[in-house]
Amino acid sequence: MTRTLLSWPGGRRLKWLVLAAWIGLLIVLQPLAGKLGDVESNDAAAWLPGNAESTEVLELSEKFQPADTSPTVIVYDRPSGITAADEAKARADATHFADGTGVVGEPYGPVRSDDGKALRTVVNVHLGKDGWEGLNAAAKDMRAIARPSAPDGLGVHVTGPTGYAADSAESFSSADFKLTLVTLLIVVTILVVTYRSPLLWLLPMISAGMSLVISQAIVYLLAKNAGLTVNAQTAMILTVLVLGAATDYALLLVARYREELRRHEDRHEAMAVALRRAGPAIVASAATVAVSMLVLLLAALNSTKGLGPVCAVGVLVGLLSMMTLLPALLVIFGRWVFWPARPKHGTEPDVTRGLWSRIARLVSGRPRAVWVTTSLLLGAVATLAVTLNADGLQQKDGFKTKPESVVGEEILTRHFPAGSGEPMVVIAKGASADQVHAALETVPGVIEVAPPQVKDGLAYVEATLGAGADSPAAMRSVTAARETLARLDGAQARVGGSSAVVHDMREASSRDRGLIIPVILAVVFCILALLLRALVAPLLLIASVVLSFFTALGLAALFFNHVFDFAGADSAFPLWVFVFLVALGVDYNIFLVTRIKEESDRLGTRQGALKGLTSTGGVITAAGLVLAGTFAALATLPLVFIAELGFTVAVGVLLDTMIVRSVLVTALTLDVGRWMWWPHPLARREDPSEDPAVSGMPDSIDSEASTTASR
C-alpha cells in the first residue's frame, strides 16, 4: 500500500495536479514566510523555563519597575581625565535620552568614575513588540545624540544589554539573505559537479526552495498561534537544514530514477519504480530525523525546545517536496533534463573502476585491521574533546569581530565595577527586607547593595557585582547569594537579574544534556532495531555514532583553541551538535545498512556489505558534501555560537559519510558477518562464501561500483 502511494506523484495525470497543488501552497503561504522574523524571540530571558528562579523574579519585578525593560549603558571616557565640558555634554545627553525611542523613566547619571577618567549614564529602554529590533533603534538614537557634538578626545560608547542586543540585531540584519545566497551557491555547485548537467540541478533546487518557503510559513504559524519559541539562530538553522536535507533526498531519488530510465522506456513507469524502491528508505530516514528532533521537546530551555519542532517541520516538508514535487517535475521535463548525458533505454553506462570499488577491495582484504585502525585513529582525535570549553560564552566573546558594545564594556570595566548597570535583583517577603539587605552585603563579589523597596508585601533589592554580569565570578556570586538567602527563615528570597538569567540558562543546558542525549540514543536504537529487525547492528551503529560525535568535538576543540582562537563555546553547543550529528548520521546509516541488508539477503552478509558500499558510496558522499556545505555556510555569520555550530556539524557530517559510514561500518559488518543481523533469520543463514577476499567479489559489485562512480 505504502509503495503504491509513493509511486503516484509521477503519474501521467497526477503530475500536473501535484505541481498545481505546490504552486497553490506557495501562493498562499509565501506572504507568511516573510513574517517569520516578526515572531522571533531573541531575549535570553524568554528562553528560560517558567519555573526558573530568575523567571519568577522577572515576573515579580513588574511591581517595582516597568516590565520588559533593558538597561542601556552609555560610557564616556578620556584617558587624560574627564573635563568640565565633558561632564556638561554627558548631562545634556541624558536630558535628550529621556525623550528617546522607547525610553522608560529618567536616565541615571552621569556618574563619574573614581579615577576621574570616565562617566556612566544608565537608560532603561522598553523592549516593545519589536524585541531586539526595537532596541537597535533605541541604541541608534542614543548614538546619534551622543556622538556628533562630543568634544575632541572624548570617547562615547553605547553598551550594556541594549548595546549588545543592538549589535546582535545589526549582525543578523542582512544575515538571512547572505546565508541563503551562500547556501544556494554551495548546493548548486555540488549538484552541477555531481550531475554533470547544466539543467538537472534546477529541479531539485526549485523543490528545495519551495520547501524552505513553506517550512518558514508553517513555523511562523506555530510561533504565532501555538507558543513555539523561535529565535534568529533557529531560523537560520532551518534554512540550511531544509536546503541540505531536501537536496540529500533529491540525490537519492534522482540516482535511482536515472537507473530506472535505462531499464524502462516510459519515464512515468521508471519514476514509479524509482519511488517504490528508493522511497521507503528516504521516508524512513526523514521520519527518523524528525522524531529525533522532536525529542528536544523534553528540554527545559525554551530555545532548545523550540529548535526540535522547527527542524522537524523543515525535514518533513523537505521530504514531502522531494517525494511529490520533484518526481512530478522530473517526469514533466523528461529525459532531456539530464543533457548532455541522457540515460537511454536499454543501455548501460560505461564500466570503469571507480573509487568505491577500490575502497571495497581495500576494506575486504583485512576488515578487522581496517575497523580497529580507523576506530583507534578516530578515538585519538576524540580525546581532544576534553579540552573543549563549553561552560558558556560571555557576551563580549560572542562576536567574531569587536562591535561597539564590546569596546564599551571593556572601557566600562576599566573604570567602574564590571557589574554596574546590570545588578543582581532579589525579591523577598517585605518583612524580611532588612535581613535580605544585610545578608547580600556578605555575599562574595557583591560590592554595593541598594536600599530595599517594599510594596504589596514584597521587598525589592538590587546588588551591584564587581564582576561582569555573565562572568564565572558572577555565576559564583549568584550561587552564593541563593545559598545565603535560603538560610533566612520565612524570607522566601529569590535571586534574579542578568547574572541569574545566564546562570539559570547554563543550569538548564546542563540538565537538558543529561536527559536528552540518552533519550535520543534510545529512540534511534529502537528505530534502527525495528527497521533492521536486529539488535547487534543497531548497537554497533549507535557506537559508531557516538564515536563520530566525540571525534567531531575533538576536532572542534582543536580548531577553536588553536586556529580560530575562540574563548569557548555556549553551554548548549554540545547538545545541539549531538542532535544534528546523530539525527543526520542516522540518515546515512539507513541509506547504507538497508542496502547492505537487501544485498545480504541474496549474496550473504560479507558480499552484501561490499555491494552495499559500492552501490551507495557515491550518493552518500555527495549527500554528505551537500549537507556539510550547507552547515558550513553558517560559519560565515558574525556570531561565534552559530559559526561554531556550523563548522562542527559540517566536519562531523564529512567524517560520518566518508570514514565512519563508508569504511568503519562496512569493515565491522564484514568482520562480524551474519551475526550483524541477530536475531533476524539472516543471522542463521550461512554466507555463500565465507571468504570476502578481493577475488571473491562478484562481478556485479564491480559493475555497480563503476556505475555509481561514473555518475
UniProtKB/Swiss-Prot annotation:
It is found in: Cell membrane. It is a multi-pass membrane protein. Residues 685-711 are annotated as: Disordered. It comes from the Bacteria. The chain crosses the membrane at residues 14-34, 175-195, 199-219, 235-255, 281-301, 313-333, 369-389, 516-536, 540-560, 573-593, 623-643, 645-665. Its main location: membrane. Signal peptide: none annotated. Keywords: Cell membrane, Membrane, Transmembrane, Transmembrane helix. Gene3D superfamilies: Multidrug efflux transporter AcrB transmembrane domain. InterPro entries: MMPL_dom, Mycobact_MmpL, SSD. One of its GO terms (cellular component) is plasma membrane. Belongs to the resistance-nodulation-cell division (RND) (TC 2.A.6) family. MmpL subfamily. PANTHER family: MEMBRANE PROTEIN MJ1562-RELATED, MEMBRANE PROTEIN YDGH-RELATED. This is Putative membrane protein ActII-3. It comes from Streptomyces coelicolor (strain ATCC BAA-471 / A3(2) / M145). The lineage of its organism: Bacteria, Bacillati, Actinomycetota, Actinomycetes, Kitasatosporales. The gene is actII-3.
